[in-house]
Amino acid sequence: MGQKVHPIGIRLGVVKKHNANWYADPKQYSEYLLNDLQVRDYLRKKLDNAMISHIMIERPTGAAKITISTARPGIVIGKKGEDIEKLQKELTKMMGVPAQVNIEEITSPDLDARLVAEGIASQLERRVMFRRAMKRAVQNSMRSGAQGIKVELSGRLGGAEIARTEWYREGRVPLHTLRADIDYASVRAETTYGTIGVKVWVFRGEILDGMDSVYNPPKEDKTRAPKRRGRSNSNRRNSDRANTDRG
């Protein structure tokens, strides 16, 4: 069953959180949901070169908060924050409430399934050999600390007349284990021969303490341990030597 269901959907509430956090009346639910889809499509088209992974949308009372996870925060922010201010004004018009945009930097893009899939898709569109693109992405992810990764391509691979599916995997990807931190993404590559589907699974380890340990990690205690009073080992050795000399 774990191989058929969406890897992120089955882990919601266990080790994964929703990409939207808001409550609405039954009459407004469909309106908010459609607005979320429009906002996500708008941001991905406008910031297509910013390497965006996730877009978190929150709706507190009378406002909206949008958190963009990107590997290139400088492109989103712009010079002196000019681009992000324009973005906030446009999103305010779209959502009908004051919108606040926050940027979250992705420090390890090779461990993000969305960014890995988009990288493979861009290589396929530039006519790079599909096996080379798959192996390069897998090697980079394993080198960055992934415990397992699987890449699957479907379509007219290499310009073949008959479409087929090929996949490549390294490490382990336990789809049935709910505590496994597995990131998943599917992207389409528009090539001259047609559309090629790219699917990526990245296994980043197991989460034993639940999703709170991922989204709210405990702060490190920087207080120093109190120093012990008393003589050090060197002083004890010197005193022992003095006693033996006296004896």
UniProtKB/Swiss-Prot annotation:
Q: Is tRNA-binding tagged as a keyword?
A: no
Kindly name one Pfam family recorded for this protein.
KH_2
KH type-2 domain span = 39-107
UniProt key word rRNA-binding:
yes
User: What are the recorded Gene Ontology BP terms?
Assistant: translation
Cite the InterPro entries for this sequence.
KH_dom (IPR004087), KH_dom-like_a/b (IPR015946), KH_dom_type_2 (IPR004044), KH_sf_prok-type (IPR009019), Ribosomal_S3_C_sf (IPR036419), Ribosomal_uS3_bac-typ (IPR005704), Ribosomal_uS3_C (IPR001351), Ribosomal_uS3_CS (IPR018280)
User: Signal sequence: where?
Assistant: none
Q: Which GO molecular function terms does the record list?
A: mRNA binding; rRNA binding; structural constituent of ribosome
According to the lineage, what is the superkingdom?
Bacteria
Q: Which UniProt keywords apply?
A: Ribonucleoprotein, Ribosomal protein, RNA-binding, rRNA-binding
Gene Ontology CC annotations of this record: cytosolic small ribosomal subunit
Q: Where is the composition biased (Basic and acidic residues)?
A: 237-247
Ranges where the record places region Disordered:
213-247
Its family remark reads: Belongs to the universal ribosomal protein uS3 family.
Q: How does it assemble?
A: Part of the 30S ribosomal subunit. Forms a tight complex with proteins S10 and S14.
Summarize the protein's role.
Binds the lower part of the 30S subunit head. Binds mRNA in the 70S ribosome, positioning it for translation.
Q: What is the protein name given in its UniProt record?
A: Small ribosomal subunit protein uS3
Origin species:
Psychrobacter sp. (strain PRwf-1)
Q: What is the lineage of its organism?
A: Bacteria, Pseudomonadati, Pseudomonadota, Gammaproteobacteria, Moraxellales
